[in-house]
């Protein structure tokens, strides 16, 4: 009994001390850019930690978040391009400042991150964590060597998915230093929008038919391989199965896709909706569709579709996928077709609709997947648990 009481007191004391350590911990987040879509998680980090933020100054035409939403100190540094690499000016001196832990974007092409990781080994009681895609499964021998050196310099890595974590464990990384954090969008806004949504006949009115409705949300670009959807629809039509397709977005492939739709006699079944920046309007379009089709890399499109209750189909070659493919649960929140195989895409679309399903139950499963694993609240709990 005495031993039990002593152990219990020690355990309670350790929990208390850990809470004190976390309360007093000074964190610094160093990122390549303050992407607008990451606003929610950056705000939560700001609320839950004593954190300063250091962001790179440019990332093409990607929208930047509003720095005034963060109460912690925010500093913008110049991302100096060096061929295919880059260097963040002013980052190295942060090692000498009063921070206990650092979170850095884990990009091997960032030279300043390499130097930062190496120099951190000379600073006692400072920990550097990386936030990264980690492993894809398509790395060359040289890339594997470089990545192993890079990630093993850190004290831990926050990964977007379990797929990357399993690959890294197979490469010899310590599983206790690999943390799956997933990804997130503007979840609170999407949730508020979702609560207002209800089934409508928007597609029946536009198309004048009762066909199942396919949808794609994103830029109409080459990498999305959207021509595959049109060819698959044509093959389905030859077999007596007709579908509607709504393309929400714009891009350099629009005219080419319009021409292809005409050639395949699908103009009455394809709606080039254009870009949509109103979340309520966009949410309604996704919510009332039956299946989101993303033949290329699915990425954030999967999260956007699932949060509003629509399942997703994409290709099954995971080394070329983005981590969000993990939100697709076979037969529940979507399905996969063979990479770059139009016949397989055709078959999978037909199979999805020929299998008896309760649309409302599918909707709930899609929403549940996002609600449980792909929110800033899930991410902040992973950070709080592992930044110790």
Predicted regions and their residues:
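A short, histidine- and acid-enriched strand-loop-helix "catalytic/donor-clamping" loop
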Residues: 111, 126-143, 153-156
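A charged, aromatic-enriched C-terminal amphipathic alpha-helix characteristic of glycosyltransferases
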Residues: 354-387
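Conserved donor-binding/catalytic core segment of Leloir-type glycosyltransferases
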Residues: 202-224, 230-233
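Nucleotide-activated donor-binding/catalytic signature segment of Leloir-type glycosyltransferases, i.e.
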Residues: 248, 255-276
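Short hydrophobic beta-strand element within catalytic cores of glycosyltransferases
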Residues: 311-320
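Acidic donor-binding loop of glycosyltransferase active sites
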Residues: 284-297, 310-311
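Donor nucleotide-sugar binding/catalytic pocket of nucleotide-sugar-dependent glycosyltransferases
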Residues: 152-202, 209
